[in-house]
Amino acid sequence: MKNVIRPSYNLYINGRWVPSSDGSTFKSINPANGEVLSICAEATQDDVNAAVRAAQAAFPAWKNVSPRKRQDILLKIADIIEKHADTLALIETLDNGKPIRETKNVDIPAAADHFRYFAGVVRSEDGRASTLDDHTLSLVIHEPIGVVGQIIPWNFPFLMAAWKLAPALAAGCTIILKPSSTTSLSVLELMHLLEGVLPDGVVNVITGKGSRSGQYILDHPDIQKLAFTGSTEIGRDVYKAAQEKLIPATLELGGKSANIFFDDCDWDMAMDGAQLGILFNQGQVCCAGSRIFVQKGIYDKFVAELAERFNRVKVGLPWLEDTQMGAQIDGRQVEKILSYIEIGKQEGARLVCGGEKVTTDGLDKGNFIKPTIFADVTNDMRIAQEEIFGPVVCILPFERENEVIAMANDSEYGLGGAVWTRDINRALRIAKGVETGRMWVNTYNALPAGAPFGGYKLSGIGRETDKTTMRHYMQTKNIFINLSEKPSGLYE
């Protein structure tokens, strides 16, 4: 199983695999058992400089590649991902800890589809021509912004790489991509598979700690745009770096999303949606439905049945096909989650199920936590306001529409949310009333290409997964044409 992973990975700069300039490396660890999976190069300032120079050199030719040719390349990338989907899914599972059923059925297919989607978008890009008066013509065109720095998180490394790479390549930008040092392997393996597909220097992948190699990207004077997915705390640093250089940044950050259930909801779908909202990827999802609001008429029944379902969830080794929930990313994340569980107890919330590590059935060496429910939570509790980033959900009762809208909006975040009801008018009222960038109706965690995704408030700036995303990697130029043959007359 482990033989799908290379024993070591270097940096990918200018179409070549090169070691760190000072020989630095770090280990990639399997979160399910603590075993070392591979050794990766740790990028230095010199390495980032080399990557930027390669991207700069590649940009003039790449930006002038025809939309048809860029489309062909994006489609070829999608084909390669699909051809090697099983290998990539297993690498992602081993490196990240998420169940193989998720990487096979969600992460890898969705990544391929994002390249196909933006292959279509690149051929539909157009400008605008306007006649301003009888002798003036205005042309509006969109040009690639240049060299971009992209930093992606550990929770969806392969899919987030697709979210970032596909629109930037479609726009004609060249890229320095940095995956998380915790989960670099699937992205590095992708670059091995793509050798010869992209011109040298168009995509450069550097690896290492965010505080080191990531900071070098933020500070580099020749990077013309930043794109980041991760915590709100680090997002602030990214935004400050962009402001300092007066360059644009797109940020997809944290969340504390509201999953709202009315008493007329479809019961089986609602139960499934409550689980999917918080247990998918072990709850390590920025838009996780970590605050569940339940109308009082069904509250007790809802809590009891959801607890039964949580207790039946198969927590296990992520590479086994019957595992429903895998390992948290590392020991530090486990300690953070457990500390919030203790906070919830101290705040007076009722612990209904879970609340501890799983150490049985051969899981004692990994980072496994039982699915956890807190009931009778109030919205001012820390567990209801702060992002836990794990399989811990708070359940709060409500009676009226305006009450639950106010409670849902009582948060500094605004990334995701959902409403479950058979009343479409009510669904639309709730969806419009909740201050969030994505509101699902009778579903959760659907993140397809073609639907814009991004946050309100402290959950981010800009949108992903939509044709408008490509515009984030472009700048607008106006060509102003005077058709008159008469001088202005101002200086006669």
Please place each PLM-identified region on the residue numbering:
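Residue-level signal for inorganic ion chemistry
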Residues: 34, 70, 92, 115, ...
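Hydrophobic face of amphipathic alpha-helices that form TPR/SEL1-like repeat modules
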Residues: 1-32
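Structural signal for hydrophobic packing residues in well-ordered secondary-structure cores
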Residues: 59, 63, 78-85, 89, ...
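ALDH superfamily catalytic-core signature
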Residues: 233-378, 441, 488-492
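Short, well-ordered beta-strand elements within core beta-sheets of diverse protein domains
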Residues: 36-43, 58-64, 150, 259-262, ...
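Conserved C-terminal structural/oligomerization subdomain of aldehyde/semialdehyde dehydrogenase
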Residues: 33-39, 223, 260, 314, ...
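Glycine-rich loop-to-alpha-helix module at the N-terminal edge of alpha/beta enzyme cores
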Residues: 35-125, 135
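Rossmann-like NAD(P) dinucleotide-binding subdomain of oxidoreductase/dehydrogenase enzymes
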Residues: 126-269, 398
